[in-house]
């Protein structure tokens, strides 16, 4: 895609393989452990958890700064002066990144941005579908591309089941934490990204395997699902046995293609270890 270059935050969890395939550029977000702030991706999630355990702290995250974006935009422009940069942003309701990008875009008339209203694998799905559209429609205008992106966003469903709610509570990203009630050890909630925000929508009880299946059932009951593909996601520590079971279960439900993504440092800092997520889509 020579005419357009898509830029995303590292919290989108677009894989290195997909970035290379579509020429997507990732801008690192930030993870803070105690007094130390590092770029997302510079240490893996397991090390984040290990350091937090060692120092007795919880991880915190922050978005990309205007300087982070300006550096990337200038580098792309120097390498591809005729390219138009499209920033498909991590949910604006959860971080400053989109605002930072708009500040960085001032005086750079080749940069356009929009809020995807998603994070992690939900944002990744929106981004990759947009990249495919651009590849198939190289002469599309920015308005046409963003109209397509909006149509994808309207069909994406994103949710996950954490096993340790302390990460969500400390991170302050959950918009309705009171919904969970007091007996946190007895439940595993379904956290969905709705209108760009993390919202607890349902409570599951039982083993993680039982809850993961109930969670998938809950997600596919939301409308007329496109069974050609489902994206599944996990944070470090989720057992291979459960992942294998959920892949078989997804196929049993009728999904033809099942892909897996291990989430990076930013989302791992919110959902904690051993979390399970899914991103099905509604039919167009």
Residue ranges and their predicted role:
Residues 55-92, 96-100, 146, 153:
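Glycine-rich phosphate- or other oxyanion-binding loops that anchor nucleotides, phosphorylated ligands
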Residues 8, 89, 234:
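Short beta-strand/turn micro-motifs composed of small residues
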Residues 5-70:
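N-terminal glycine-rich anion-binding loop in soluble enzyme alpha/beta folds
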Residues 89-91, 114-117:
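Short beta-strand->loop
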Residues 51-57, 73-76, 132-136, 278-279:
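A general structural signal for short secondary-structure boundary/capping elements
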Residues 3, 11-32, 41, 84, ...:
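Mixed-charge interfacial surface used for oligomerization/domain docking
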Residues 50-53, 58-59, 79, 204-210, ...:
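Non-transmembrane, interaction-prone segments in cytosolic or luminal domains
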């Amino acid at each position: 895609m020579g005419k357009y270059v898509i830029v995303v935050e590292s919290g989108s969890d677009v894989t290195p393989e997909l970035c290379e395939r579509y020429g997507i550029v990732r801008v690192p977000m930030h993870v803070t452990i105690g007094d130390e702030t590092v770029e997302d991706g510079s240490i893996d999630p397991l090390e984040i958890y290990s350091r937090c355990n060692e120092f007795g702290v919880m991880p915190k995250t922050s978005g990309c700064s205007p300087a982070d974006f300006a550096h990337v935009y200038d580098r792309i422009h120097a390498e591809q002066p005729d390219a138009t940069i499209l920033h498909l942003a991590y949910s604006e309701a959860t971080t400053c990144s989109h605002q930072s990008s708009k500040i960085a875009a001032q005086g750079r008339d080749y940069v356009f941005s929009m809020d995807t209203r998603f994070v992690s694998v939900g944002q990744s799905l929106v981004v990759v579908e947009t990249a495919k559209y651009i590849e198939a429609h190289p002469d599309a205008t920015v308005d046409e591309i963003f109209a397509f992106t909006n149509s994808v966003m309207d069909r994406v469903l994103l949710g996950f089941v954490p096993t340790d709610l302390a990460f969500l509570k400390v991170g302050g990203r959950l918009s309705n934490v009171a919904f969970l009630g007091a007996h946190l050890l007895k439940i595993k909630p379904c956290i969905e990204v709705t209108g760009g925000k993390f919202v607890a929508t349902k409570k599951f009880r039982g083993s993680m395997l039982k809850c993961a299946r109930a969670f998938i059932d809950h997600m596919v009951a939301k409308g007329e699902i496109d069974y050609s593909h489902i994206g599944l996601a996990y944070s470090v520590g989720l057992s291979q046995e459960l992942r294998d079971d959920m892949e078989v279960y997804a196929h049993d439900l009728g999904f033809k293609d099942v892909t897996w993504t291990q989430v990076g440092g930013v989302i791992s800092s919110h959902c904690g270890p051993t979390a399970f997520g899914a991103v099905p889509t509604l039919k167009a």
